[in-house]
Amino acid sequence: MQANFLKEMLANIRGINSLTILNQKQFLSSVEHTLAKLVETNKVIYISMTKSAEDVFAMTDQKNNLFVIDVFSRETTFTNGVKPNTIYISNPANLTSIQIAIDKAIKKFPDAIILFDSLGVLSVYSDEKLFQKFIYLFSNKMNLLGGSILFFATKGSMNDEILSTVKQFCDKTYDFSELYIASVELAH
């Protein structure tokens, strides 16, 4: 699928916290396209709620530019037991563990772009107020550090109040969820 609609978001990612809202049909290919483009020239810390670390690493040839925090599989999925630039989180509801893992990854990749692949999935595991506080504190911390965060959310995957709160903490929101995607429509 062509992801031309992501060009603006990719061009303006440095130094800001941004939220990209997609529809379900766009989600997978858009996240994969974004990761592939970002790791070409940037270090990326990828917080995965939807894929194993092994699957995330398989999406790119630029493995040295990628650090994965795997909240999806909760334990190693690498067949050879090697865990390159990977931290596993055993409980997705433990937002403190996720923050500690991000802090460790930032020590290794200080100027990395941080990519959350699915805020909707993360919000399911957490109390609403704790989730909002986590996003607020994390966004503020990254602003102070001059960091870059890209949150992905699927339209309808989280309640409107939480989504509205996340939007408030982001410098830029891209809502591509209503776009007509010709290649997807033709495939059906």
Question: Model-derived features: where do they sit?
Answer:
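Glycine-rich P-loop/Walker A and Walker A-like loops and their local beta1-loop-alpha1 context
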Residues: M1-M59, H188
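Substrate-engagement module of ASCE P-loop NTPases
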Residues: F131-S157
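Glycan-processing catalytic domains of CAZymes
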Residues: E32, K107, F131, E161-I162
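Phosphate-binding/switch region of NTP-binding enzymes
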Residues: G147, T154-H188
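Domain-start "cap" segments at the beginnings of catalytic or binding domains
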Residues: N42-S97
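Phosphate-binding/switch loop-helix module in NTP-utilizing enzymes
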Residues: T77-L137
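Structural motif
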Residues: L19, I113-F116, L150
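Short acidic, S/G/P-rich loop/turn micro-motifs used as interaction or catalytic elements
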Residues: K25-L28, S52-A53, E75, G120-E128, ...
